């Protein structure tokens, strides 16, 4: 069973805590993307990154000095977004690190697929960015089915905790043999159930922590998740979609 999760824009370098364990699987493809980005002007990169001058400057300098092989941080400790804050890997026990290393895969526009302990350096790139390398019109074409082939294992089970931008990389290549379960976090807004972005990100991270703490190997056990006020809604769920509703006091 594999769990897929989106990356975060905000990243840090931490070479003092835990050493990474190996390099990402597709480091040669990453090198190709790095070269393509370095061939662009600062103004072109600002458009690709869709960010302000300050963030452009920061990431332009990162790109100029980027070393994909040295002073690396384990991926799960490098990302600082909301999901990763609620996963809280910095306080994982050894068994929880082992669980996520075996089961969690972080999808990345720059690295493709990351195991939690893969060594990474901060970058800025989203899967939807206008990047045309070789004959590829975009990054979805560039990565093709590589992410799917990397993630799928002998169990054929994938738990989707990623955003649509990243889960698309997997969904396009699913086969009838695969069991693909999307986890949906929502709450009542008037008469409708809606997904609130921030709460969903919090819940995705908390869900990974819950699965790691409970060493979950069977998708049915995910239904017991009851953190951050969420409860499983069996009446709204199916074999391919587990719906959790946040009960607002």
Features from the language model and the residues they span:
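Internal, well-folded beta-alpha domain core
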Residues: 89-239, 243-249
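Short hydrophobic beta-strand segments
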Residues: 2-6, 157-160
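Active-site helix-to-loop segments that bind/position phosphate- or nucleotide-bearing substrates
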Residues: 4-91
């Amino acid at each position: 069973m594999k769990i897929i999760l989106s990356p975060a824009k905000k990243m840090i370098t931490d070479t003092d805590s835990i050493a990474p364990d190996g390099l990402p699987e597709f480091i040669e493809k990453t090198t190709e993307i790095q070269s393509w980005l370095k061939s662009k002007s600062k103004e072109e990169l600002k458009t690709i990154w869709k960010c302000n001058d300050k963030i452009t400057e920061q990431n332009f300098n990162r790109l100029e000095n980027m070393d994909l092989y040295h002073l690396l941080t384990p991926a799960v400790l490098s990302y600082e977004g909301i999901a990763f804050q609620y996963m809280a890997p910095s306080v994982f026990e050894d068994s929880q690190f082992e669980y996520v290393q075996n089961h969690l895969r972080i999808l990345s526009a720059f690295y493709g697929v990351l195991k939690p302990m893969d060594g990474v350096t901060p970058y800025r790139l989203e899967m939807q960015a206008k990047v045309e390398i070789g004959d590829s019109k975009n990054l979805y074409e560039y990565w093709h089915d590589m992410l799917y082939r990397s993630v799928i294992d002998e169990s054929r089970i994938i738990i989707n905790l990623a955003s649509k931008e990243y889960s698309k990389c997997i969904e396009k290549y699913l086969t009838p043999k695969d069991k693909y379960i999307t986890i949906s976090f929502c709450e009542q807004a008037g008469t409708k159930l809606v997904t609130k972005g921030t709460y969903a990100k919090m819940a995705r991270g908390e869900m990974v922590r819950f699965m790691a703490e409970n060493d979950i190997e069977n998708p049915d056990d995910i239904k017991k998740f009851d953190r951050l006020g969420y409860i499983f809604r069996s009446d709204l769920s199916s074999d391919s979609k587990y719906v959790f509703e946040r009960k607002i006091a």
